[in-house]
Amino acid sequence: MNGVEPQQSLFDLWRQYHYVYKEQYQSHQTSYIPNLLPEIAVQLNVYDVFGILQRRLGTETLQKALDPNQTIDSPLKHHTDGSWLKKSNMVGINVRTIQSFFNVVKYALTIPKTQDSIHILPIWEPGVVGSLYGKVSFNINPEFYSEELARAVPSLNTVEKQLKVSINLLHAMGKSVGMDVIPHTDRFSELVIAYPRFFEWVRRVGGRITSNSESLYREVEEIIWHYIGRNGTANGTSLSFSKNTLFSPEIPILTDAQRLEIIFGHVSDVKGRLRRRIEIMQDIINQGYETLPMTMAPPYRGLHINSEDYILDENGNRWYTYEFDEPQAMSRVFGPLTRYKLFHSKDDNANWQLDFDNPQKCVWDYICRKYYECQQRFGFDFMRGDMAHIQPRPDGVPTFQVSDFETNRKYYDPLLSIKKFVQKQGVPYFAFFAETFLVEPDFMGYGDELAHLEAIEAEATLGDLQSSVVGTGEFMQKFVDYYRYLKTRQFAPNYTIITADKDDPRFDEFYRTANHLRFFVGLFLTDMPSYMGLGFEVRNLHIERGANEEYSKLYVFSIQDNAQTDKVTHGPFVWGQNYSLFWWVEKMRELAERIWDDVVGKSTEWLLEPTLNQKLMIWTTAENPKYIFVANNSSEYGINDELIWQTIGNQTAHLIFDTTPYSDQHICRIYEVR
């Protein structure tokens, strides 16, 4: 690929030369299929995909990968811990945007070895407004089922089998795969109804809370028990057991699956399970009970109902807005969600205080076991810990020793406990990617967030570079801070390019310039991990707001109500048409393929280190430097060639990559040292 953009369209190039690009991948000349647009990739015929993978992987490996009863080993199996994540370049995929797990495999054909890990956004059955982060069960979301794959391989006739073989294929392609771990559910999920004691309840009359006693779950269990008595069990089982046998996790007579079948019905009966869940929810609501909505940021606790603000649903239920008694800057209440009750309360919750010395151990055991079962069943290599910034202890982060997990930290944070549980079961490489934003102390969680990240043993964290314009003071300060943390703390901040949360019309201004620089630095600053959301490589600049269907954030939920004009979507996700950016992304990928063995994972030596005001940055590898990388974060000043050559010194360097033909702003270059 030369430095100038093609005269014919990328679609024409693909039609004319697709067999050449496929052969480069099939014969291991490249680790991805060059010049394959994502929108073309996800439309590839299933048999075409099988043919490509058969020639790439071999018949035996492909057959094994397509058997859900067999497992392709993780490419990370030789690792003894999760530290590999600290230098991983990750791609985040909302499956709803590409419709099926098998389409993740198709999209992965466009992703080279230089982006080695794939984070799959939540895979569970969604709840209110179809929110992926408001799961109603640990069942896999049936909307991610591929009819095309099932027709080609009739034995792959469930979404669970398709997820397993998709991860098998991704492993065979050299990718690690991560799942979202969510410490909350929909407010009336199957989990809430099956295990009322695992959640926090309130009783209200109209728009007023009349009780928030810790023991309210017993009254809710009674309501559910009476419903089953009136309507029978969902699977026809006779009620030959006690109420406590049904609800108590300490009585091991019923398995989780049996309990859920008794209350809701068989997993495959989606409509029947939904009907039972809504009927039970209605009984509970009619008697004045509901789960406490989830909160974020200090003070976390102390809520009241705004009796004037509510939503009326189709059944006539009023869903009131909850508010903080004493809100702070980032205090949020998430009305559709409820968090697991991880700790007992003090004084029967009279003052909304949790007793952090008294964990509800059955809840911790349950969520650790359920996420481990998912890891084992499908073969996930790492977890993204949703809302990892939550730290509700008003006294801040306790002082811990690294070796004291079993004695002091086992019940500190659920995400930490899940990671350690999975590792202890024989998956030592299982890693933890934390959703935190590296903000100042006491802002999104009590105490120092950096200390919290170390206490929960997160290998890497998302950070917040995606939330500012490249080259601004805010962006530069974040980058300088993050790189310092990379070298001085036990976790690695990501150079985050874009996330599904930020692919949102409210944040278009962040991505109207310098997208090529974001990708360049994320790729070639090889001692810092990076994160890129699906579709960035073709994302439109959105100088004016695009259609809702162009934003992947609006597919995190599923809203068909036309009255919600900013969120409603009609039909599938629409890929961007920024083919000029894609061409330059491909050029960077092609060059990275060629030089990767000389730079991957190596420490950086700054030749010109960035600061708040020094926006031109120049670096090479600390060991055996063969290439020099230049990136100009400034939008005001062009690149200073004299300064570059002064910085390079007396080395003989040859320019091999330059983005000037693409844009005279935010120029990026690579020099080869000879």
Annotate each language-model stretch with its function:
Residues 1-674:
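Active-site and adjacent substrate-binding regions of carbohydrate-active enzymes
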